[in-house]
Amino acid sequence: KLIRQLAEVVERVKLQRRDGDVLLTLAKYNVLLADHLRVLCCADLQAASADNYLKRLAKLAEAGLLERSYFERRGYCYWLGEVGKVWVAQMVGRAPVARAGLQVHNLLLADFMVAAMREMQAVGGEAMWEAEWEQIYGAKTRPDGVLKVRLNGYETNWLVEADTGKETLAQVVRKLQGQETYYKRGEWRDWFGSDYYPSTLLITSGGEGRLLHLKRALESKIESVEVPVNWALTTTARLAKVTNIANRPELGPLQQEIWSWLDDTELSSLNLGSQDEES
């Protein structure tokens, strides 16, 4: 039934190439605001043309390709509708992974990724986001995504975790500890094409107080184990204070890609053990 409905919808709305870009982007990020789609799918358009295109999203929603709802004071947020999921499945050969109930969480990640893309574009670099982990991660060890940054001939990978303050500190720590299992399995060497395990960036929307509690919770789990995991902790407010990479000449090229977003960020090299006690 949905396949037949999809054929009717494609004909009725005259599906455009940019519409397809929007659907595939939503499959990747799960949920996005119009401002995110402006950067991710309309960067080649003038402002007026981008505004006109974004008005088309309402038509795609009416056709069942998208779903949308008003999100606080930030306007409409969009995700794939049932018909849109069928279209994506036909294009990529598998159904998109649904992550229901994570609207705030996913929008935090989208905010970060859009900021990363803008920062890299400003200095001639490139930022990419990977979030499909079914083939290489188990359910307990999957990060929220990987930021791949290319600048000055170098590529750096960062595992990214988002914290909206809804989980207990112990839950966050256990999730991060799960990476030790993934590290020991070794598949990451083929995935990243490197013998250097990526550092992890934990972003919290909970403010400075939450950041301090997370830092203490992580430090309480330090053990003398074989797996070194480098962590950077920051807040959404700190990330909003973007410092241009070009103004940080004292940093080497491998560090410049990310540290411009992390002024005054707490950086630790933590060996995360497998203790079970609560933080």
Where are these regions (language model features)?
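Acidic-and-aromatic substrate-binding clefts and catalytic sites of carbohydrate-active enzymes
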Residues: 45-47, 136-138, 208-209
